[in-house]
Amino acid sequence: MPEGHTVHRLAAAFDRAFAGQRVRTSSPQGRFSEAAQLDGMVLLGAEAVGKHLFLPFAPAADVDPGAPVVRHVHIHLGLYGSWTFAGDPGFADAHAIGAPRLRMGEREEELDGAADWRRLVPRPTVRLRIAGAHGLADLTGPTACEILDAQGRQAVLDRLGPDPLRPDPGGRERRRFVEAVRRSRTTIGALLMNQKVVAGIGNIYRA
């Protein structure tokens, strides 16, 4: 399962690839028909919190991400989910592995540099396709892929502990983690795996 650092890397790739662009969205698999609600909207950016990815969509690029009109696509890759990017040279990641295509998940694979991403037919397993001016991203096999309003997004965040990769200028989140550990009699290894205590850590960093 991709851990927090991978999801943060994924969010950064989305920012570079799509932030501020009006995009096309579809669900070739048909299991995320809500994609039609987002088609033609602007993808404001991307946010990673622990193992969760949030993609805020709005009618225009100048809409505040916290505005009521914003719809947040919430994605958790789980054990089998992955994103595949394809596009113009340098798309999504200036240091992309196997550019111009990289898979952000458990696996990474290469696309023939001569191939035209605009002609790529989505696999039947693609839950969500996002296409912009210079490339596209295909999502397959996620545990969660849903549209949330601001309250729904906050409900997900309220279930999570601090994410050590997010800015914490006042140290509030660090103190929250320390207090949770001190209150518990559970072993530190088990606490690190508890997403309510600290978000994003999995077996790799626990080990």
Label every PLM stretch briefly.
Residues 1-207:
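Structured catalytic/nucleic-acid-binding cores of DNA maintenance enzymes
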